[in-house]
A protein has these predicted regions:
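Enzyme catalytic cores with a strong preference for nitrogen-chemistry domains
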Residues: 1-354, 370-379, 408, 413
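ATP/NTP-dependent adenylation/nucleotidyl-transfer catalytic domains that generate, transfer
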Residues: 5, 16, 21, 152, ...
Length: 632
């Protein structure tokens, strides 16, 4: 047996906090070394934080990462552990994201990332250069390039995140060159369903390349990107460790690398592919780390025994319904996003939400409370502030819902009418209009929203509070929001959450954590209450139809007539004329609302589609719907 203990450390980093990030990692390094971990893996860009965006263009930022890496090496000198961690370097005038290998107080090598994602929410090709096969060099006297490492326990191949997300991956040539343990350090942002995609992809890679594959992910929120942490260890396609997500910390498992090599020798397909590859390729160079120079501590390791007491029977699994997994993932992601934005900015004293008594602001408050309950379990409400600012159009039902949920959660609520300010603003606007120019009903509605937005900013300035914006993705997509009003805030919590998902999340929360305030909010049809008897679906369309149009047009990029055909199939009770009207209305509103998206605050990203300009969907502000709505 060749037993190796693999530790996966999900570290919650802050971009730019190089030495603070290293100190967080060192705490885990000491704990893992004390637990006889042989190889410890940390996330991509762990030292500088991820994503650094254009901050990486500052040479001083990159240089400081090297100093922090040297500090990490010095502090781990006496540890019998190989550490693999992420760092950015400036090598021969180019910037690379690398996996650094540290052992025995020395930086043993740097392996640059080869696959640079420049799609969806990622822009690495903008600032980073890619490594390439058989690249060799030295960086400050340290081996740099496409290399693998031989230690006293076996051969390790470090790689970075996207390098595993393609069949043409460096893992192939490195395992054919003798690597037994592949360590993938990652900064893979959360999107709904991504965890399952990662699992399936990585277990396939470990099986295809007949290796032990250790994968660790970054955890925490940085700007609008949310990282769910966790990690896996797969041995030749068999799951050995599934580390917990949504928390900072480390987990470890022991594997027998002799088993990896035995399975290779028994797999004729792998052997023949290896022989064919070796006939036309040179092996990847191996950096030898002699045992006289560095030795791991593996004497006390024990063979991995199934916790359920059988090598033959499957381990019992706790069944979790798909809806529960979905809702918990989204809620955990959003709560972490609020908390890390609050804490990492280091300027806020409290969190504020303007409640309307409706669904969106209620969900935003519940998400903030979810974070606060973990941050301060004894008094989560002390971190939060809520405000209800009624006008003549606000209903008694929404005020009751707002008061009730705040009472139940222990959140201080202030009720401050906007009626007097509304009257003053109406008079001021009338005075600005030309004779005969009417003050429109839409203007009256927007004035109310803008008074509330202005007051929330004033509260934020005076209290040092984080002002959370409460709008959902569906209504932002079609511009059903007021610039300077309900579009205001420092952080948009649910701006990447479609309206139908908002409703599902509230239903789920009411089932799992029943509150009278949620029940009251769900009783009333959703609407902004800026005019008498205002109902959102009557002014727009049924939200299920709107979200279908949004997905098909914005995400799938279908033409309007194609959207109509799909919507008719989804909703057979609707007539073709009605569907045509809905789709036409959606496309017009969508393409004429882009100017609002670019003025919206930063939003938390949970899906593959995002309206933040620098994320997944980048559209010109000045555009026309002519191409989409030509008469056939």
């Amino acid at each position: 047996m060749r037993l190796v203990k693999i530790g996966l450390a999900s570290v919650n980093t802050t971009v730019g906090a190089t030495h603070a990030n290293v100190e967080r990692a060192l705490r885990f390094a000491r704990e893992m070394a004390a637990a006889d971990v042989t190889v410890a893996a940390y996330p991509e860009q762990m030292i500088g934080g991820y994503p650094p965006e254009d901050l990486i263009q500052w040479q001083g930022f990159v240089e400081d990462q090297w100093r922090a890496l040297e500090h990490f090496a010095r502090e781990t000198r006496e540890q019998p552990t190989v550490h693999v961690l992420g760092v950015a370097v400036l090598h021969e005038g180019l910037r690379y994201g690398c996996a650094a290998v540290v052992a025995g107080g020395e930086i043993r090598g740097l392996v640059p990332k080869e696959k640079l994602p420049t799609y969806s929410i990622y822009y690495e090709g903008r600032t980073f250069s890619r490594g390439f096969p058989y690249q060799r060099g030295e960086h400050r006297g340290v081996p740099f390039g496409d290399v693998i490492f031989r230690f006293d326990f076996g051969v390790v191949a470090p790689e970075v995140c996207e390098d595993a997300w393609t069949t043409e991956c460096p893992m192939r040539r490195r395992t054919y060159s003798g690597a037994e343990l592949v360590v993938n350090i990652s900064g893979s942002a959360f999107r709904v369903g991504t965890d399952q995609t990662r699992r399936e992809m990585l277990i396939t890679r470990a099986g295809d390349h007949q290796c032990t594959l250790a994968y660790v992910n970054l955890v925490g929120g940085n700007d609008g990107l949310l990282f769910d942490g966790g990690g896996f260890v797969f041995q030749n396609g068999k799951l050995m460790l599934d580390a917990a997500r949504w928390r900072e910390g480390w987990e470890a498992t022991t594997v027998d690398l002799d088993r990896t090599m035995r399975l290779r020798s028994e797999n004729t397909t792998w052997r023949m592919d290896h022989t064919a590859w070796a006939a036309s390729h040179d092996p990847v160079p191996t950096i030898e780390i002699p045992a006289t120079e560095f030795r791991t501590r593996r004497e006390k390791l024990t063979y991995p025994v199934p916790a359920h007491g059988s090598f033959l029977l499957p381990a019992p699994e706790k069944y979790v319904p798909a809806r529960t997994r979905y809702c918990e993932d989204v809620l955990d992601a959003l709560a972490m996003g609020v908390g890390d934005y609050f804490e990492k900015n280091r300027v806020f004293k409290t969190v504020g939400v303007a409640l309307s008594g409706g669904r969106d602001s209620l969900l935003t408050l519940l998400v903030a409370h979810r974070w606060a309950a973990r941050k301060k379990p004894d008094a989560p409400g002390s971190l939060l502030r809520a405000f209800y600012m009624p006008s003549r159009y606000s209903s008694a039902e929404t005020e009751k819902a707002a008061r009730t949920v705040c009472d139940e959660l222990g959140i201080p609520l202030r009720v401050v009418s906007i009626d007097a300010a509304f009257e003053r603003e109406l008079e001021a606007v009338r005075a600005m209009l030309q004779p005969g120019e009417p003050l429109t009903q839409l203007t009256e509605q927007n004035i109310q929203a803008r008074i509330r937005g202005q007051r929330m900013w004033s509260w934020s300035n005076s209290s040092g509070g984080l002002f959370l914006q409460t709008g959902n993705m569906s209504e932002r997509a079609v511009g059903y929001t007021t610039v300077g009003g309900d579009l205001e805030g420092a952080l948009a919590v649910i701006a990447n959450v479609p309206k139908t998902v908002v409703m599902v999340l509230l239903d789920y929360l009411q089932e799992t954590h029943p509150l009278e305030g949620i029940r009251l909010a769900l009783q009333k049809p959703p609407g902004p209450e800026l005019a008498p008897n205002q109902v959102g679906e009557e002014e727009l369309m049924p939200f299920r139809v709107l979200d279908a149009c949004f997905h098909l047009f914005a995400d799938e990029k279908l033409l309007p007539e194609e959207v109509e055909r799909v919507v008719l199939t989804m909703f057979p009770d609707l007539t073709p004329d009605v569907v045509h009207g809905y789709v036409t209305k959606f496309v017009k509103m969508f393409l004429t609302s882009i100017y609002k998206w670019v003025q919206a605050p930063l939003s938390l990203h949970i899906g593959n589609l995002d309206l933040d300009r620098e994320r997944a969907l980048q559209l010109p502000v000045v555009t026309h719907a002519e191409w989409a709505l030509k008469k056939k």
